């Protein structure tokens, strides 16, 4: 379908379009025209990705600036999905225009997913793959071979073959999904990872994970060549604040400190060896540092530093590395002193939390280590590892963490906290101390993105309440909007169950969650829904701990035996492989008619990235409100920080956080307008939180369904499922929830008549101002 938004011709790869897709595109165009940031909440399963791509690529191709698009998503499967959508869109554009546009679209993921080297790709741990790859591809190994052809150095042929080709000729033009990229590179014996890395500046659109833009350790290497007028899109961005915080946080355990000591000793031995054989090497390095050169000046283009800079670009120091860590021996003994100090700090019996400033003061009093040399730790370690030509870099990963920790704690003060806990997990009998350097302010990591790029679009299916994000991430928006879902026939039934059939109020509140009457009520609710739900049913709990305790109580009450009669029961566990197996079995049981129930956790893998479309999810049951564990020291510190700096009250944030996760769980069952499902929120506290649900869920929640008992909810569900079982005529949806080209033109004309819009010749103008939608123009 081809239509115009103002003067912009948009090619949409489907013959029909949803009204909300059209409104969404109009708002994205407004954001791009005005420049600035917007937050848009689009209902689940209404083709958000394809709308985003259709509009932004039309915008890119139509206007002469050809602004690059950076599309960030969370998981590997979402990135792959976006690439496939992009491929379809570009095929459609080629067909409609009659020629192939000069266009490149690529996706980037970790080495582990893209490596083709027969030995390295066998490794299961991502960090090991990274280190082995670096060892075979860094410029040092290549130089060594050139100097001494007999040297025992292994190079990666996939990477070496890239030197024979010009960067723009690595790949033909077009869009490459991961599958297509790997296949092409396998045939040509080329390295897919480095192809994408080096072609980023040549791409029209690059699709990758948030970390490549938000985590300074990676962003500096990957995204520094991206132009400032790029359009940045954060898709599935309901958790973006957590990603920002993780990118500047670090945990150290006693085991890591032990390994770091071993690493420092190994470095010492290596320095002694080099002193005997080639002492000039160390002298050269020392002289370079005296001249005030940095790793950026010393490393060649093809080399990556051993320790990536963990701080944001604007916080880097440009002065020379301090004198007391220039000599290799001095630096290693400096690291050893630091590690020994950290070991003594770990010997605690109760939780300690302190600011970076007080930690550095105490460190200076005891070990005479100044703040300045600490800031250069990661850079100095990179240079030393390079000078010593260390090949077994895996031995030094713990040392890398120590250097990163030193650089972070000496660079940042405001919005950071150091917490030392004697027990890594609650109720542990054996002390296993852990030192957490944690970022409390989500805006620090994302600030460079807002400062650097003119348009940033943050979007998701569950991002309500919208005004929380600009406050948490400290930025201004030009547009905030939540879209309702247009339906010819109600295809999802949200309900809030506040009491069991015996009228006892149900809740997962900590004080009463193990009360037998509440557990029994939750159990009988599960049995009743299992009886009437066709095929698949997904149940979410607030935490693994609560799920384990309630399931074992159900077992003793005989509730699970009752459920078995109707459906299989499968459980999500913290182990990724077990969960994958459970999901596979669940899908099999749903497809062959046995039906199944999947018990999972609100912040787990299942709730975040797995879709239960059609028969795989007909009912989703949310047992209890998924609040965070409020006794966590880090959470307490973060809440206090937000209250003092951003005036966000503790309860507001906790409630917002719980509701975005609950909405995320509910959205799993509705993956399109032809899909249907029942959404049950089972906790009496939900009835007060209706306003915090996304607009499209709240619109389907009638006043009568806010305070139901189990038996009333069951009778509503029976009626709803009977209605949905009737064959539907697709014609009923036309013009209401699905628009043909004619409907779209009709809508544009009616808007034009209302808004007195000046018509371009032969072009359909559009001005979309829905009074009823919560829109903010600043």
UniProtKB/Swiss-Prot annotation:
Q: What happens when the gene is disrupted?
A: Essential, it cannot be deleted.
Functional pH dependence: Optimum pH is 5.6 for both helicase and ATPase activites, suggesting they are coupled.
Main subcellular localisation: nucleus
Residue ranges occupied by any Helicase ATP-binding domain in the UniProt entry: 7-285
Pfam families recorded for this chain? DEAD_2 (PF06733), HBB (PF06777), Helicase_C_2 (PF13307)
Query: What Enzyme Commission number(s) does the record list for this chain?
Result: 5.6.2.3
Gene Ontology molecular function: 4 iron, 4 sulfur cluster binding; 5'-3' DNA helicase activity; ATP binding; ATP hydrolysis activity; ATP-dependent activity, acting on DNA; damaged DNA binding; DNA helicase activity; metal ion binding
Composition bias (Acidic residues) maps to 766-778
A GO cellular component annotation here is: cytosol
Residues that hold [4Fe-4S] cluster according to the record: 115, 133, 156, 191
Question: Which keywords does this Swiss-Prot/TrEMBL entry list?
Answer: 4Fe-4S, ATP-binding, DNA damage, DNA repair, DNA-binding, Helicase, Hydrolase, Iron, Iron-sulfur, Isomerase, Metal-binding, Nucleotide-binding, Nucleus, Transcription, Transcription regulation
Kindly list the positions annotated as binding ATP: 42-49
Q: Where is this region: Disordered?
A: 750-778
* UniProt effect for mutating residue 111 to H: Intermediate level of UV-sensitivity
User: Which reaction does this chain catalyze?
Assistant: Couples ATP hydrolysis with the unwinding of duplex DNA at the replication fork by translocating in the 5'-3' direction. This creates two antiparallel DNA single strands (ssDNA). The leading ssDNA polymer is the template for DNA polymerase III holoenzyme which synthesizes a continuous strand; ATP + H2O = ADP + phosphate + H(+)
Q: How is the cofactor bound?
A: Binds 1 [4Fe-4S] cluster.
Q: What top-level branch of life does the organism fall under? A: Eukaryota
Q: Which InterPro entries match?
A: ATP-dep_Helicase_C, DinG/Rad3-like, DNA/RNA_helicase_DEAH_CS, HBB, Helic_SF1/SF2_ATP-bd_DinG/Rad3, Helicase-like_DEXD_c2, P-loop_NTPase, RAD3-like_helicase_DEAD
Q: Where is the composition biased (Basic and acidic residues)?
A: 750-765
Q: State the protein's purpose.
A: ATP-dependent 5'-3' DNA helicase. Component of the general transcription and DNA repair factor IIH (TFIIH) core complex, which is involved in general and transcription-coupled nucleotide excision repair (NER) of damaged DNA and, when complexed to TFIIK, in RNA transcription by RNA polymerase II. In NER, TFIIH acts by opening DNA around the lesion to allow the excision of the damaged oligonucleotide and its replacement by a new DNA fragment. The ATP-dependent helicase activity of XPD/RAD3 is required for DNA opening. In transcription, TFIIH has an essential role in transcription initiation.
Q: How does this protein assemble?
A: Component of the 7-subunit TFIIH core complex composed of XPB/SSL2, XPD/RAD3, SSL1, TFB1, TFB2, TFB4 and TFB5, which is active in NER. The core complex associates with the 3-subunit CTD-kinase module TFIIK composed of CCL1, KIN28 and TFB3 to form the 10-subunit holoenzyme (holo-TFIIH) active in transcription. An additionnal subunit, TFB6, plays a role in the dissociation of the SSL2 helicase from TFIIH after transcription initiation.
Further comment = Present with 14400 molecules/cell in log phase SD medium.
- Output this protein's name: General transcription and DNA repair factor IIH helicase subunit XPD/RAD3
Q: Which organism is it from?
A: Saccharomyces cerevisiae (strain ATCC 204508 / S288c)
Originating gene: RAD3
């Amino acid at each position: 379908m081809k239509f115009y938004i103002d003067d912009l011709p948009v090619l949409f790869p489907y013959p029909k379009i949803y009204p909300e897709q059209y409104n969404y595109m109009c708002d994205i165009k407004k954001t791009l025209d005005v420049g600035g940031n917007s937050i848009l909440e689009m209902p689940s399963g209404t083709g958000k990705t394809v709308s985003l791509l259709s509009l932004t690529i039309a915008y890119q191709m139509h206007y002469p600036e050809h602004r690059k698009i950076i599309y960030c998503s969370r998981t590997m499967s979402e990135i792959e999905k976006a690439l496939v959508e992009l491929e379809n869109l570009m095929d459609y554009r080629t067909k409609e225009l009659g020629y192939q546009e000069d266009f490149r679209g690529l996706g980037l993921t970790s080495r582990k997913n893209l490596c083709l080297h027969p030995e390295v790709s066998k490794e299961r741990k991502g960090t090991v793959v990274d280190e082995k790859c670096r060892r075979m591809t860094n410029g040092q190994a290549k130089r060594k071979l050139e100097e001494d052809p007999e040297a025992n150095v292994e190079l990666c042929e996939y990477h070496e073959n890239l030197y024979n080709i010009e960067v723009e000729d690595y790949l033909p033009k077009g869009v490459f999904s991961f599958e297509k990229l790997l296949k092409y590179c396998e045939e040509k014996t080329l390295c897919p990872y480095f192809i994408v890395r080096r072609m980023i500046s040549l791409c029209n659109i690059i699709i990758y994970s948030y970390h490549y833009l938000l985590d300074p350790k990676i962003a500096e290497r990957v995204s520094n060549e991206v132009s400032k007028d790029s359009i940045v899109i954060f898709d599935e961005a309901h958790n973006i604040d957590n990603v920002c915080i993780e990118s500047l946080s670090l945990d150290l355990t006693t085991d890591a400190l032990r390994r770091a000591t071993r690493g420092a000793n190994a470095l010492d031995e290596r320095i002694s060896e080099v002193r005997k054989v080639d002492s000039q090497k160390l002298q050269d390095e020392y002289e370079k540092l005296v001249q005030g050169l940095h790793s950026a000046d010393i490393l060649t283009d093809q080399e990556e530093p051993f320790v990536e800079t963990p701080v944001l670009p604007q916080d880097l120091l440009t002065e020379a590395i301090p004198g007391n860590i220039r000599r290799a021996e001095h630096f290693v003994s400096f690291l050893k002193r630091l590690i020994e100090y950290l070991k003594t700090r770990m010997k605690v019996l109760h939780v300690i939390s302190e600011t970076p400033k007080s930690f550095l003061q105490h460190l200076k009093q005891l070990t005479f280590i100044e703040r300045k040399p600490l800031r250069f730790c990661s850079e100095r370690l990179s240079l030393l590892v390079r000078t010593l030509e260390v090949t077994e870099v895996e031995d030094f990963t713990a040392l890398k963490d120590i250097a990163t920790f030193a650089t972070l704690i000496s660079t940042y003060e405001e919005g950071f906290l150091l917490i030392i806990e004697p027990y890594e997990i609650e109720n542990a009998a054996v002390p296993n101390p852990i030192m957490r350097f944690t970022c409390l302010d989500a805006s620090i990591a994302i600030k460079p993105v807002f400062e650097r790029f003119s348009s940033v679009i943050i979007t998701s299916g569950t991002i309500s309440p919208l005004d929380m994000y600009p406050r948490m991430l400290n930025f201004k928006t030009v547009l905030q909007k939540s879209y309702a879902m247009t339906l010819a026939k109600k295809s999802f039934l949200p309900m809030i169950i506040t009491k069991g059939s015996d009228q006892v109020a149900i809740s997962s509140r900590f004080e009463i969650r193990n009360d037998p009457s509440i557990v029994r009520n939750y159990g009988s609710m599960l049995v009743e829904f299992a009886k009437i739900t066709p095929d698949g049913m997904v149940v979410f709990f607030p935490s693994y701990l609560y799920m384990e305790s309630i399931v074992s109580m159900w077992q003793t009450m005989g509730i699970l035996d009752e459920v078995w009669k109707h459906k299989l029961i499968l459980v999500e566990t913290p182990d990724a492989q077990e969960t994958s197996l459970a999901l596979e079995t669940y899908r099999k049981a749903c497809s062959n008619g046995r039906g199944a129930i999947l018990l999972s956790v609100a912040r787990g893998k299942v709730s975040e990235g797995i879709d239960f479309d059609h028969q795989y999810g007909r009912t989703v049951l949310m047992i209890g409100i998924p609040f965070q564990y409020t006794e966590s020291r880090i959470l307490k510190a973060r809440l206090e920080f937000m209250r003092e700096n951003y005036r966000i009250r503790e309860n507001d944030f906790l409630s917002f956080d719980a509701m975005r996760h609950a909405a995320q769980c509910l959205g799993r069952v509705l993956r399109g307008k032809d899909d249907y499902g029942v959404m049950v929120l089972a906790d009496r506290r939900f009835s007060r939180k209706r306003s915090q649900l996304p607009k499209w869920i709240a619109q389907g929640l009638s006043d009568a369904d806010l305070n139901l008992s189990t038996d009333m909810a069951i009778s509503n569900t029976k009626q709803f499922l009977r209605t949905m079982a009737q064959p539907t005529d697709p014609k009923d949806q036309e013009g209401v929830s699905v628009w043909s080209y004619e409907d779209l033109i009709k809508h544009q004309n009616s808007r034009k008549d209302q808004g007195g819009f000046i018509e371009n010749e032969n072009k359909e103008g559009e001005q979309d101002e829905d009074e009823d939608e919560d829109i903010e123009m600043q």
